[in-house]
Every structure is written in C-alpha cells, then in structure tokens.
C-alpha cells in the first residue's frame, strides 16, 4: 500500500512541474542532435536498452570516432543517419526534479525551413548552435530571424566545439559580440550565451573546469531556471468557442481553450461578432467547477443569459476587445510544394474560425539569409513574405507579437486540403490602403428593406451557407 501511495505522490508532484518547450537550430554539423543526446545521456534519462542500441549504432553508423555518437538518439530516419543530418523534426521528452521538457530538434538546411517553423511554433525557448571555429554564419542569422518571426522570447546561443579552439575566452567573446550586434534589431528580449562542448559534455549538464573564465550557468541549469510564466498573455481574455455542449435541455455550455487572459465566475463577457453581453455563470471541467481559468486550460463556460454563440465565435471582456476586421497584414511562410497562385481563394483557419480569404498583394519577400527585401509575384516552398489579406467574414485577432494564439493562422487549399501556408498577423489594414475592390457578395439588409427583427434569422441562414463554403457578407 505504501508503494502505491509513493507512486501516486510522485505522479502528483510530476504533474505540477511546469513544462518548457524548446527547439534547437543550427547549421549542418554544428552538433544539435549531439547536444540533445548528450543532455539526455548526462542527465541519466536513457534506459539500458537505449544505451546498448546507442553503443552498437555508434560503432556501425557513428561519425564521432571512438566516442559514442549521441546524435543517433535523435536522427531516426534512415536518410538522416546515412547523410548525418536532421531532416524531420525529432521530438524528445524528459524531465528533471524541477521541470519537464519537450525538445524539438529541427533541421538546419534551408530547404527544410517549413519543418523548423512547425517545430518552433509552440516553443518557449530556442537553442541556436554555432561552431566555435566558424562563428556566426549565414545559417545562424537565418535561424535567428525565424526564431524572432515565431515570437520566441528566450534564445540561448550555444557556442559548441569549444574544445577545438582550446576553450578560448577571446574567441567566445568575439562570437558573442558579433551575434548580439546582429540580434539587437530583431527585438528578442532574452539572449544568453554559453560556451560548451557537446561531445565531451562541457557546460552541458555540469559546469566545466575547462572554462574557469565563464561565470554563467551550465545549459541544463539555465533551462531549469529560465522564467517563462510571464511569456503568457494574462491580460487580454480571448475564448474562441470550439463546441456548444447541450447534453440536455437544462445545460448549455461553450467549450474551448482559454487562448489568453483570465476568466472568473461572474465576469461580464461579450460574444463576437454579435456584441451580445452576459455574465459567466460557471466554469466547468471534467474534475469539477473552477472559480477562474487561464491559458492553456480547456473549460466549458456557461452564461447567465441565453445568447446565440456557435463555433468560430469568441467570448471576450467588453472593455478589452480584439481587432475585428476583414483586412490585415501578416508574415507568411509558404509551405506547399505548389507555388502560390495569387488569384486563388483559400480557406483561412484562425483560432476556431474558418473563412474564405484572398491574397490582395505581396508587399515584399524576405531573403532569410541576407534579410533583404524584394518584390515578387508569388511565393514558392519555404519562402517568407509580408502579405495583405482580405477575408469574406470578420476575424477576431490580435497582433502575433502580443498574442500568439489569436495572431496566428493557416491557409488551406480548398481543393487538396493541404496546409498551404502559416501566417503571423502584424496588424489590420485600413480599407483606404487596400488596392483591390471587394468582390465578396454582400447582403445590405437595410437597402433590401428587411426589418431588424428578421436579422438574426438571416444571419443563421448565412452562417449555414458559410459552413458549406459559400461566403456572403451581411451589412446592417
């Protein structure tokens, strides 16, 4: 019985640890996979069978000479092991006494930019590796730009292979100075630089005696203590409705994930786009009712009043509204093998909201290697650009830098259902700045002589058409 209680106590304690999601990025052969493998090895997070397999594979496939090739722990695809590179995003989970970790080992090659965007979309922190011999190179700048694009607030510059430059403090300081000069305009608030040797384990889990001049923490100590709670947006309440729960006539609740902000019982809320107002009656979960909820909790909200709210709509505080608009600018990463057709209409999915959208213009493409801007007629795979959109119906959004959950979206090809692109919203665009006429069909209800008491019924009919792919806008 005591053993069962001990197990339960351990699981309860483990459940309460906070979670740090991090990605690694770097050029080919900078040692990303080796670093993560070393982190798992030195923190005693490998099972006996994994260690046996690692030793066998190191002799047969390894690229580390007589050393164990820790990269083989993460390079799982046959093509990766044969080429000695990372292609897919490899995820690894481990935990320490203080924190749980999910590591995304992302590919360094430019042709796999979309894989890195996918791996970094949920990350709190990025580890960017550089080879101490090579210093800051083109790929370092590219990966740092992508990290800033994704809104990742914490970056560790891991200067690897310090053993090959005799753990030179002067060389380390040169690299740090060059990197900080580049990163300053990108607006990343927290940059930490650590000298290490992934192969030998210096400054990975424990402080190294070979860098007496380095006064900072080892990599694992830093990862365990970096403060990430303030990265969440707890001020702007946004609750995209995912599902309306109606198990019986006596209960009607709105299910979803709290995207940002805090909601409490009794709070006044507004439903968008209708603008109708009510108060929160209860916050329901599987484990019982809560007095308040915050991101990323999934809850069911019940309201004091019977107001019409459905999937794709949003509950917010009336005194703190998101931007409600059909026109906006965004940074777009093209992820489809097929090049962009600027005349094509797409589905846009933002939070739980889905609408038809068109691309009005490409302001400029960003060269991820040089940061130069250029004018282009379309985008190809892995290219990034600043793009202007118009949607068929209004979206409820915040700029991505302010609110990741409500400032991000995907474009879906209506024919193939492929995810064509991912986007990060910059801000709304005023209609006077739009250079293309609005060609979505419009129902102007006052002009048609329709009485206001019939508006709600017409809105429901139009919503039903929208779910079938027919977009019609209503003006009241």
UniProtKB/Swiss-Prot annotation:
Residues 26-33 are annotated as: G1. NCBIfam families: CysN, PRK05124.1. It catalyses: sulfate + ATP + H(+) = adenosine 5'-phosphosulfate + diphosphate. GO terms for biological process: hydrogen sulfide biosynthetic process; sulfate assimilation. Residues 160-163 are annotated as: G4. Its EC number is 2.7.7.4. Heterodimer composed of CysD, the smaller subunit, and CysN. This is Sulfate adenylyltransferase subunit 1. Residues 84-88 are annotated as: G2. PANTHER family: TRANSLATION FACTOR. GTP binds at residues 26-33, 105-109, 160-163. With CysD forms the ATP sulfurylase (ATPS) that catalyzes the adenylation of sulfate producing adenosine 5'-phosphosulfate (APS) and diphosphate, the first enzymatic step in sulfur assimilation pathway. APS synthesis involves the formation of a high-energy phosphoric-sulfuric acid anhydride bond driven by GTP hydrolysis by CysN coupled to ATP hydrolysis by CysD. Residues 17-232 form the tr-type G domain. Pathway: Sulfur metabolism; hydrogen sulfide biosynthesis; sulfite from sulfate: step 1/3. Residues 197-199 are annotated as: G5. Keywords: ATP-binding, GTP-binding, Nucleotide-binding, Nucleotidyltransferase, Transferase. One of its GO terms (molecular function) is sulfate adenylyltransferase (ATP) activity. It is an enzyme of class 2 (transferase). Belongs to the TRAFAC class translation factor GTPase superfamily. Classic translation factor GTPase family. CysN/NodQ subfamily. Residues 105-108 are annotated as: G3.
């Amino acid at each position: 019985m005591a053993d069962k209680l001990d197990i339960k106590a351990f699981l309860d304690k483990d459940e309460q640890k906070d979670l740090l999601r991090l990605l690694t990025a770097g050029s080919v052969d900078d040692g990303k996979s080796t670093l993560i493998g070393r982190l798992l090895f030195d923190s005693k997070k490998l099972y006996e069978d994994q260690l046996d397999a690692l030793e066998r594979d190191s002799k047969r496939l390894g690229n580390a000479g007589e050393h164990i090739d820790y990269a083989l722990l993460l390079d799982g695809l046959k093509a990766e092991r044969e080429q000695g590179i990372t292609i897919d995003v490899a995820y690894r989970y481990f935990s320490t006494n203080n924190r749980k970790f999910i590591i995304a080992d992302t590919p360094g090659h430019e042709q796999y930019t979309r894989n890195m965007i996918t791996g970094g979309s949920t990350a709190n922190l990025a580890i960017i590796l550089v080879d101490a011999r090579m210093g800051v190179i083109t790929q370092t700048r590219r990966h740092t730009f992508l990290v800033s694009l994704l809104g990742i607030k914490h970056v560790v510059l891991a200067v690897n292979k310090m053993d090959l430059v005799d753990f030179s403090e002067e060389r380390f300081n040169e690299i740090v100075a060059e990197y900080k000069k580049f990163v300053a305009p990108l607006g990343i608030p927290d940059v930490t630089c650590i000298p290490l040797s992934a192969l030998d384990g210096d400054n990975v889990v424990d402080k190294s005696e070979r860098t007496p001049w380095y006064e900072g923490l080892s990599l694992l100590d830093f990862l365990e203590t970096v403060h990430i709670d303030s990265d969440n947006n707890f001020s702007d309440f946004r609750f995209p409705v995912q599902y309306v729960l109606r198990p019986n006539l006596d209960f009607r609740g709105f299910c979803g994930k709290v995207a940002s902000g805090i909601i409490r019982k009794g709070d006044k809320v507004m439903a968008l786009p209708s603008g109708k107002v009510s108060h929160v009656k209860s916050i329901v979960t599987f484990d019982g009712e809560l007095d308040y909820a915050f991101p990323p909790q999934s809850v069911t909200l019940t309201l004091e009043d019977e107001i019409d709210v459905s999937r794709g709509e949003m509950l917010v505080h009336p005194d703190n509204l998101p931007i409600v608009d059909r026109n906006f600018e965004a940074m777009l990463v093209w992820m489809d093998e097929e090049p962009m057709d600027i005349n094509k209409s797409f589905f846009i999915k933002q939070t739980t909201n889905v609408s038809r959208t068109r691309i009005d213009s490409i302001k400029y493409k960003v060269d991820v290697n040089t940061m130069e801007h250029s004018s282009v007629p379309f985008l190809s795979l892995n290219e990034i650009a600043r793009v202007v959109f118009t949607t068929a119906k209004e979206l409820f959004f915040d700029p991505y830098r302010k609110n990741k959950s409500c400032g991000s979206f995907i474009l879906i090809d209506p024919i193939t259902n492929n995810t064509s692109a991912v986007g990060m919203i910059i801000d709304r665009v005023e209609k006077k700045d739009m250079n293309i006429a609005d060609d979505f069909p419009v129902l102007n209800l006052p002009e048609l002589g329709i009485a206001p008491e019939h508006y709600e019924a017409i809105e429901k009919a139009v919503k039903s058409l929208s779910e079938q792919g027919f977009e019609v806008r209503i003006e009241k």
